[in-house]
C-alpha cells in the first residue's frame, strides 16, 4: 500500500499462480475434490489431473506447479504446500527450493551461519516421502505429512526444509507429530500443527500429543476433520463435536445443533458441514459471504478456506461462496484519506 501526496492510496495486487483462472475453475464439470492452498484453490478432476488458480507469494513461485501431475486420487495441503496421492499409492509434492529456519536456530547461530547450516542439513535429511508405497490417504500438518496404509497402519515424515523443526538424521518432526509407527487398526488420520490424530475402526481416538480426558470417552467417532490447530469430529449419529476448538470470536465452534452430517470442512474462522442429503450449512465469520451456502444442493464434497467455501456437486461442478483470499485486493486506487499532521 502506498499513500500518495494527494491523499489517495495505491494498492498492488499479489501475483497470480496456477494453471487456470478462477473463471475456468468455476466452469469445471468433472471435479471430485477441492483443497485450499493458502490463497490458491486446487481442484482434482476425474481424469486424475489437477487444476488450480489463485495468488502466490514470491517465495511460493513453484508451489502451485502441478501441470505434470497425473493419476492423482486425492489432494491435501497445509496452506503452503500441495500434496497429491497417486493411484499407485505414492505421493507427490509441489516443489519447494527454499529453507525454513526456526526462530530458536536463528537466535542461536545468527542469520549467516543458520542459513549455511540449514542448506547443509536439508541436503542430508532423508526424503522419506519419496519411498512411500501403498498409501490410501494423506493428511498434512505444519511440519509433517502422515499417510494411512491399506493395512490400517500409518507412516509419517517431516519436511527436510524445516530446519530446527525436523531431525535431519531421521527425517521426522521434532515435535513428536510423526510418532505414529505403532498405530494399528486405523480408519482415518488427521495431521494438525504439531499434532497428529488417528481414528481407529472401533470409533476411538489416538493422538501424538497429550490425550484430553474427554477424548477417552469417545467410542462412536465416525470421521475427523480439521486444519492447523483446529479439529472436529462427526459421531455415528451424525452429530458433531469439536476436538480442538478454533477461535470462537465469530461462532466457529457453534456446531452442537448439527445433525445428519457426513463431512466437515474447517476454515480460518468458519466451519462447514455437509449433510447426507447433499445440503450444506456453515457457521462462523461471514465477512466475504463464505457461509452463504444454505441454497446449495446435491453436494458431495466441501472445502473451507480463509474467505471462501467450495462445494463439489454430484455432476462435478464447482460452487464458490465467498472469495479467494487474494481478492481482497480488488481496487487499485482507494479514495482520498486524511492523514493527521505530525
Indicate where each model-derived feature is located:
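Short glycine/serine- and acidic-residue-enriched loop/turn motifs that recur at repeat junctions
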Residues: 3, 10-27, 51-68, 92-131, ...
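Conserved core positions of repeat-based scaffolds
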Residues: 1-2, 11, 40-43, 52, ...
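A detector of tandem-repeat and repeat-rich interaction/domain scaffolds
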Residues: 252-266, 271-275, 279-286, 290-304, ...
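Glycine-centered loop/turn positions within well-structured domains
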Residues: 144, 162-163, 195, 229, ...
